[in-house]
């Protein structure tokens, strides 16, 4: 009995001061853990690294999403989701253990299991001071930007955050990012005029020891514009740059542009429609209809809705001008995935490629309503015909994930690509020319000749084979059949077909034509 008592007395300190296993946030609703050393058994996600340089970060039970990234706008929803985000945060102080990895960073999206430290309670909130070095996992810094799927075209859309060509560190970091992504086309935003664009393109060529990168001039104005740099070894611009003036307001057409490119490998064409829509800025006077209603969409949502509607109209214009139906719509739309402007595009039958491939990633992180939350402000959409040729789309996680202290002008300042901007670039991989859902003419398919002037209200289709034509379908750029015409006689032997087009609006169309063996080919038609 005496030996048992002595053993109990010997173990008493360990029993009194043993680490207590807890779950966050369930076990942190009262002050019962104050002063105790705890081990949080559930895996936590790093959601705020803004103050990492000062020795503290914020962890949560899973990622924190901007409310309208995952939910339809609404005042009640917005308030509820903000409260959930606020309640799902715990501040962690490093103590004698550093948060940073070998690269000197700690990234949003990293996870940690079995976090151990001393809990302190103040003003209704807990703070954990580490007593054991944490082991962070996941979301490591990316180095290259490739996929396993076969593709022949890579498009990068990227807000480069006020590039003026006057900051050597910014130039070095942006060029490092462009070089690492190795795109055929760079669709860039917030480049200040043609002189800054020339500066960036020249620096990219110098870094790559080549002269293959060219640019397309947009504006001489010293203000942020949308623009293109392209690899002249792989693509060639077709016709002139087009500006969307359907939502005109001063210089804003410089921020909404479109350009067609022909892929040299197979002469296939597609169009890039690049956009930078109105910001959510609430810092100055505005008409009442543009005010923040508290539903989560911020200021100027009606303006962005108008820009979305104008984009749908602009697509019709540029498909006719560039004579192709394959359109990629990219850019900083200043709208999260469930907000009204994005739904306008989706209801316009554009395909949201990021929601298709990586719905649980993000391009931007922002502190608002007492939480640092993530979502997509930058997007990749495609018309139905191009969607069939897209192999993948995703954000390149080099910026929004990194601590704000590493931004240009911060300390420490390194000449790598990480935190070269506040937005993650969006990369879209395309196998251009693979399929539009219609087989192209060949020796086993009829070749069609179009005769006549569509302004007269009809076209005549003529086949060069011995088989008669039986059916013609007119398809719009969204892949929908908007008109179909059959021969009245099942025993038809005619190799020509009269097709009425008087009721069709001006624009670009695909024409599917079938013969008596149900073989199909396609023609491109532009109605003036």
Can you say where each PLM-predicted feature lies in the sequence?
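Surface-exposed intrinsically disordered loops and tails
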Residues: 61-102, 243-244, 283-302, 356-368, ...
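N-terminal, active-site-proximal structural segment of metallo-dependent hydrolase catalytic domains
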Residues: 93, 122-225, 285-313, 324-326, ...
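Structured beta-strand-rich core segments of catalytic domains in phosphoester-bond hydrolases
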Residues: 191-193, 197, 201-280
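C-terminal outer-membrane/trafficking sorting elements
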Residues: 439-528
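Bacterial Sec-dependent N-terminal signal peptides
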Residues: 1-19, 520
